Amino acid sequence: MTFPIISIIVYGAWLALLLVGSRRAKLGSFNQDFMSLEATKNLQGLAALGVICHHLSQPPQNGGPMDALGQMQFFREIGFWFVAIFFFVSGFGLIKSLATKPDYLKKFLRRRVLPIVVCFYVMNLFYIAFHLFLGTNMSASEWVCKIFGIALLNDNAWFVPVIIIMYAAFKLAFKNESSKARAFLFVFLAIALQVGWFLFNKHFTWWWGEPGWWKKPGALWLAPWYKRPVALWFEGEWWVNSTIAFFFGMLAAQNEKKLFDFFTRAWLVKFIASVLLVAASFALKIYLYGKNIHYWLEFSGDNSTLPRALMLSVDTLQVFAWILFVYILRMKIWSKNKVFEFLGNHSLEFYLMQALPLRAFSILFGWSDKGFRAKEGLALSGYKDQLSALLYLVLVLAATALLSVIVKFLTKKICALLPNWNSSQGQKAAGGQDAR
């Protein structure tokens, strides 16, 4: 049996990062700063690393060296857990800032949304250049839509329109709303509308055209680009299965002291309960998979909504359980180190740029349809294959980190050129959803 090099290194690195610089509360006491700006920055860094590990765990299994990345299987089904952390921290930070900063909503969208929009278009330039270099075949209308963001050239960039929608909903909800209950309800409904649209539309516009057009052999791939799977906004469960964490974050910030007092009583019992809830919700998802209940049933001719709604309900339970687990755990221990700090300060850019190195190095290594096919018969877990996969992993991480620094630098420079963009808060926000 071949020694699992990838597993040892990846999971060992995670363990080291979680332990190095960890802030541990003394016996009988609790961390008071586990949801401070510094702490949540490091939490975002952890989430950014989790997302790229999720994407690294998803290569096609074609009998080549990339199969060794299957040792990261643990991350394959939980990518949205890490994205949920981004939404949770964003919702938490907004409510905290609203409560502590005078006139926080003044120029809110300009301060919070504009840097994200600039970052999106800076990112898009890199992907445009990459696809031009590859000679990607797209119609003029598809190019125009993807250049301007009406459709996405980078599938991972779905986070940008969703977080902008959430920020806009937050601004509308709290701008003139004297009742916080109604404001919270408005934000919840904004999330529900996004969920509702996905449950109706699913992964492509099945309703656009003659009834059942998509069931004909090859029809999906012969259709105009905008009718093909995951071509437009909200065509995919990843658009909606973690956004509820934004609302959870708002609730946590609004009830911060009550939650702290509640969880400090019988902390161990509640922590164990959160662990069991995470395990049970994950097991329930696996059970649904076993019963052929999942998001992609339309590709086998079943367009009913109920199976997706069931799976989304379980995903929502998973997000709640995961956030609860993280929240309770961090009351006792949270991690602070240079890696998480760097990733936390570049979380949006790191998230947006990772798809480019993932694809580019798979081509350079000959593991993609755009490069040489892997030779048949290569050992799936041989040492040579594992070392090749490990080199790929390191190069992807390094290139993504470098690109994130470049994109953040360019974003800040462009924002600085905009009229009246000299406030310190605006400069802090220029890297994404970092500043409170």
Where do the PLM segments sit?
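Short glycine-rich loop/turn motifs that provide flexible caps or phosphate-binding loops at active sites
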Residues: 90, 248, 343
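Membrane-cytosol interface segments of multi-pass membrane proteins
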Residues: 1-196, 202-203, 211-222, 346, ...
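Physicochemical signature of membrane-embedded alpha-helices that form the seven-helix bundle of GPCRs
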Residues: 43, 72-82, 233, 237-240, ...
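Aromatic-enriched alpha-helical transmembrane segments of multi-pass intramembrane proteins
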Residues: 147-152, 173-307, 362-363, 381-384, ...
